[in-house]
């Protein structure tokens, strides 16, 4: 027997049933996708789909060459024809904005876009963190005021309500100011951290040289006292940045959205400015962040487009659905409405016709394949989770009737004329 080929570690199959190490099912995932489709339409966002492979330069320019994502986590390879460096996308914003610039979507109006799809990072797999993971992203492009900042926060809070997890999530916010303000803060931060360089761990020493703001994001408990006393970016904000942040907070207050100001919240990608935020939870162990985002007013220009102030956020679907499966509520119904079975010569063709007629009327019908006893077929109908069973045997064929059974017992088992099949099932379903 040939050796089985296993999936790549950290890249999961999505099956109709739960797996030992991956509890999410395809039906649960589909129910979430349906919820997201309704949610995004309610806020006027339109879907965009981009390739999973992009030129590596896109992420170097947008995310930042010195970031952990670009430096250590991307899957990068050369195209065999022209040696062009390509990468599997590690996040969705850069690809979305590349498409917007390439196709001139901001030519005459702002855009509200959303995406959903797989992303890839070469990380150590653990619960809620995988090498292939999926994101839902929201991008509001061409909007300058703090009102859109507050709107997308409210939008995300609305989704948490729909998923039944609002009480388990905490909103943290911060302002990173503009480029000049961050530069002034960076200089002060480097001067401060350099005094403690001998106490920094190796990762923080590296970040001190490449992206000192990320030192403040360390999870090392031995460095918390040093980081807590570090210069705060909020103290370097100018009047315009302060006003934007103050108006943003006032809008959150007006919407009744509670938040915590976290001056050490910086996000892991270089393109952020002004408003940044994260939704966190204490229910997933170390993987606390479920959703994060912020403003990236200079990114579209950085990618070759005309300047356009913008904001967005992304959520990791696997991590989010782990939270929903444990604490939330998501209506999942993968079972068919009807299980159609047959017994005897020519009954298989007739039940196929009945099943197709029911499907045209909106019923989900699973048709039995093969030839087994009615007892065996009824067992499969029960295992399928179908609410109703449709039986066509020799007596029904001869009399022009069908037998219907309510698997929940409410209507029992009845024989009805074939022409009344759809009407009867509709009555039972709506009762």
Curated annotation (Swiss-Prot):
The protein, known as: Histidine--tRNA ligase
Keyword Cytoplasm assigned: yes
The protein's Enzyme Commission number: 6.1.1.21
Quaternary structure note: Homodimer.
A GO cellular-component term linked to this record: cytoplasm
Pfam families: HGTP_anticodon, tRNA-synt_His
Biological-process GO terms, alphabetical: histidyl-tRNA aminoacylation
Family of the protein in this entry: Belongs to the class-II aminoacyl-tRNA synthetase family.
């Amino acid at each position: 027997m040939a050796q089985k080929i296993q999936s790549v570690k950290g890249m999961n199959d999505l099956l109709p049933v739960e797996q030992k190490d991956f509890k999410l099912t395809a039906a649960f995932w589909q129910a979430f996708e349906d919820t997201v489709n309704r949610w995004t339409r309610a806020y006027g966002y339109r879907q965009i789909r981009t390739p999973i492979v992009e030129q590596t330069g896109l992420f170097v320019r947008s995310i930042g060459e010195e970031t952990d994502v670009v430096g250590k986590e991307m899957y990068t390879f050369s195209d065999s024809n022209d040696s062009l460096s390509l990468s599997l996308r590690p996040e969705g914003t850069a690809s979305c904005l590349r498409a917007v610039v390439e196709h001139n979507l901001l030519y005459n109006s702002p855009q509200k876009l959303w995406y959903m799809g797989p992303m890839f990072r070469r990380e150590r797999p653990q619960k809620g963190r995988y090498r292939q993971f999926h994101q839902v992203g929201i991008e509001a492009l061409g909007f300058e005021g703090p009102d859109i900042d507050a709107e997308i926060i409210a939008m995300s809070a609305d989704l948490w309500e729909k998923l039944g997890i609002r009480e388990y999530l905490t909103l943290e916010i911060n302002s990173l100011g503009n480029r000049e303000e961050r530069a002034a803060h960076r200089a002060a931060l480097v001067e401060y951290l350099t005094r403690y360089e001998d106490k920094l761990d190796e990762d923080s020493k590296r970040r001190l040289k490449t992206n000192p703001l990320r030192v403040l994001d360390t999870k090392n408990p031995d460095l918390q006292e040093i980081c807590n006393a570090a210069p705060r970016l909020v103290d370097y904000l100018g009047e315009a940045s302060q006003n934007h942040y103050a108006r943003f907070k006032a809008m959150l207050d007006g919407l009744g959205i509670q938040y915590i100001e976290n001056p050490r919240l910086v996000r892991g990608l270089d393109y952020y400015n002004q408003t940044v935020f994260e939704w966190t939870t204490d229910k997933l162990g170390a993987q606390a962040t479920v959703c994060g985002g912020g403003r990236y007013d200079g990114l579209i220009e950085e990618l070759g487009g005309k300047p356009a102030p913008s904001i967005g956020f992304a959520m990791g679907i696997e991590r989010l659905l782990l939270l929903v499966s444990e604490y939330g509520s998501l209506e999942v119904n993968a079972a068919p409405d009807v299980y159609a079975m047959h017994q005897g010569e020519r009954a298989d063709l007739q039940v196929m016709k009945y099943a197709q007629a029911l499907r045209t009327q909106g019923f989900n019908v699973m048709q039995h394949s093969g030839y087994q006893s009615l007892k065996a077929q009824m067992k499969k109908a029960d295992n399928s989770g179908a609410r109703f069973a449709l039986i066509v045997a020799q007596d029904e064929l001869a009399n022009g009737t069908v037998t219907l059974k309510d698997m929940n017992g409410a209507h029992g088992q009845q024989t009805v004329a074939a022409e009344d099949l759809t009407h009867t099932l509709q009555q039972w379903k709506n009762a």
